[in-house]
Curated annotation (Swiss-Prot):
It is a lipid-anchor. This is Synaptosomal-associated protein 25. Keywords: Cell membrane, Coiled coil, Cytoplasm, Lipoprotein, Membrane, Palmitate, Phosphoprotein, Repeat, Synapse, Synaptosome. Pfam families: SNAP-25. The modification Phosphothreonine is found at residue 138. Part of the SNARE core complex containing SNAP25, VAMP2 and STX1A; this complex binds CPLX1. Found in a complex containing SYT1, SV2B and syntaxin-1. Found in a ternary complex with STX1A and VAMP8. Interacts with HSC70 and with SYT9, forming a complex with DNAJC5. The interaction with SYT9 is inhibited in presence of calcium. Isoform 1 and isoform 2 interact with BLOC1S6. Interacts with CENPF. Interacts with EQTN. Interacts with HGS. Interacts with KCNB1 (via N-terminus); reduces the voltage-dependent potassium channel KCNB1 activity in pancreatic beta cells. Interacts with OTOF. Residues 1-20 have a biased composition (Basic and acidic residues). Palmitoylated. Cys-85 appears to be the main site, and palmitoylation is required for membrane association. The modification Phosphoserine is found at residues 154, 187. Residues 111-120 are annotated as: Interaction with ZDHHC17. CDD domains: SNARE_SNAP25C (cd15885), SNARE_SNAP25N (cd15894). Residues 1-25 are annotated as: Disordered. A lipid is attached at residues 85, 88, 90, 92 (S-palmitoyl cysteine).
Length: 206
């Protein structure tokens, strides 16, 4: 009889311990799920900010392209005026053949870069998960929730990986665009400075 009582006590203790571990494991999966959801939200906010930054860079580069077009027109007018005044003060062709100009604008004189960087689109592969994530002991609702939580965690982690790839691709694209903008800005500044010098000479000669 005493042995039966001891065995019952041991079984009850094992059951109590199993329940305790199940409760702790359930809380652990809940915390994991909360953390990855917070990370997902942070990732989404970062992607939105990168997208907004990309739109701003597009507007800036369009502005550089418009300045390039305007300068072409101004240089043409300056050349015509110089011919009318009997002067030869427009080194426009020399400028356009310079390495800096070609680097900024390529061979397309309208300011559209010939080789635009292509965005890399990462294919989203959906992985089918067979079976559960945990080894069942109590086989109750807690383990069902644990399994569901871990499945969600796994899915969100996969999404976070793709987000990280998207961020890396977008940052690379924007870095290349910033380099182009800097080159175009330098080219535009040089042209404006030279246009001012030509205008000063023409006014002085008048």
């Amino acid at each position: 009889m005493a042995e039966d009582a001891d065995m019952r006590n041991e079984l009850e203790e094992m059951q109590r311990r199993a329940d305790q571990l199940a409760d702790e494991s359930l809380e652990s999966t809940r915390r994991m799920l909360q953390l990855v959801e917070e990370s997902k939200d942070a990732g989404i906010r970062t992607l939105v900010m990168l997208d907004e930054q990309g739109e701003q860079l597009e507007r800036i580069e369009e502005g550089m392209d418009q300045i390039n077009k305007d300068m072409k027109e101004a240089e043409k007018n300056s050349t015509d005026l110089g011919k009318f005044c009997g002067l030869c003060v427009c080194p426009c062709n020399k400028l356009k053949s310079s390495d800096a100009y070609k680097k900024a604008w390529g061979n397309n004189q309208d300011g559209v870069v010939a080789s635009q960087p292509a965005r890399v689109v990462d294919e989203r592969e959906q992985m089918a998960i067979s079976g559960g994530f945990i080894r069942r002991v109590t086989n109750d609702a807690r383990e069902n929730e644990m399994d569901e939580n871990l499945e969600q965690v796994s899915g969100i982690i996969g999404n976070l990986r793709h987000m990280a790839l998207d961020m890396g691709n977008e940052i690379d694209t924007q870095n290349r665009q910033i380099d182009r903008i800097m080159e175009k800005a330098d080219s535009n500044k040089t042209r404006i400075d030279e246009a001012n010098q030509r205008a000063t000479k023409m006014l002085g000669s008048g």
